[in-house]
Each structure stands twice: as structure tokens, then as C-alpha cells.
Amino acid sequence: MLWSDDENFLYAMEAVSPAVSWKERLLAGDLNPACARTAGQALGMTIAGSWQDPDFEARYGDQRPFDQLRTDPYYRTIARRHPAIAQQVYDWIAQIEPLRLALTHGDWSPKNMLVRGDGLVFIDYECIHFGDPSYDIAFCLNHLCLKGFHMPQHATALHDLARTFLAATLAAAPYEDWKRARLAT
């Protein structure tokens, strides 16, 4: 971070170079499990480090960016265009909206993870909010599994990456507390 202006929601930071997105690496057939593990560990640590923390909730409790950039353009649009599944989509929205558990990136996908040396740099936090981080887990798993349809020759390896990502996330996240919180809703 070079500078920030909190009042006007502005900041400047150094460019990340040289780096290529994990998505680009995946599409090129570079199916490195270390990237999946790192992505999962980072997400799990974010969840654990912000779990039901009132300071994070106060700072990131506004879910309007997530609603404007994810819930409305994707999920409510799906519900409007596909009436046969509309109720299930609206039920899911009603389930996830009130949950305030931990920091949630809102776009935890390989396109927002830059591979740099042995690590990843995570970018694009415009949807971040204090909500239900299971969204991030599902979002990334969805990306990894769907690439198996796009690249059937790598489907098994991509599904293995998804399992590696999930295991690393759950190992770092407060999974038992999470299960109790989800069951209580």
C-alpha cells in the first residue's frame, strides 16, 4: 500500500509483476496442487482470523456491494429468468443474507489469484463483506469443477485440486463453530 484516503475510499498500491492469474495457469494445463492448497489455507485463515469478530463486522458489515455485484446480477437474475427454480434461488438468498460469520471476499476465484513465485497474491476485493464465507468456498469449488467440463482431459486432476482446496480451507477455518452457526439458522 502506497497511500490511502479512507474518507474517499481511495488507495494506491504497487503493481504485482511479474504474475499471471491462477486461472490462466489452469487453462494452460498447469495443475499445481500447491496453488489450491495456498488458496484454501489463505481463505481458511481469513475466516478463522475474522470469525464473529465485532471489529470486522463493524468495518465490513455493509453487504450492499455484494448484493449489487453478486446477489442481484447473478442470483436474482437467474430466478427471474428460470421460474422453475426461482423459489430455490430465493430461499438460498434468504438463507445466506442474514448470516454474519466472517469476512467474505465474494469473488474467491482463480482469476483473482495471481501466481507469483511460490505464492499467490489475492486481488479484487470489491465485494468483500462480513457474511457467510461458505459462499467463497462454493465459488472457488465451482470454478475448479467447471473447468473439468471445459478441459475434460484434466477433469480428474481439477477435481483433485478442488478437494485439496477444500481440505486446506477446512483445516484452517473454525469448522466446528461454523457447523453450529449454520445449523442454528
Where are these predicted regions, by residue range?
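ATP-binding pocket architecture of kinase catalytic cores
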Residues: M1-P54
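Feature marks short, surface-exposed loop/turn motifs that line or immediately flank catalytic pockets
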Residues: A19-V20, H129, G148
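Soluble or luminal CAZymes and related metallo-dependent hydrolases
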Residues: L31-T38, R81-A84, A157-L161
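Alpha-helical elements of Rossmann-like donor-binding domains used by nucleotide-donor carbohydrate transfer enzymes
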Residues: T38-M45, L103, F139, T164, ...
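Active-site catalytic-loop/activation-segment of kinase and kinase-like phosphoryl-transfer enzymes
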Residues: M45-Q95
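Active-site acidic catalytic loop and adjacent metal/ATP-binding pocket
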Residues: Y90-Y135
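Active-site activation/catalytic loop segments of kinase-like enzymes and analogous catalytic loops
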Residues: Y135-P174
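All-alpha amphipathic helical-bundle segments outside canonical DNA-binding/catalytic cores
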Residues: P174-T185
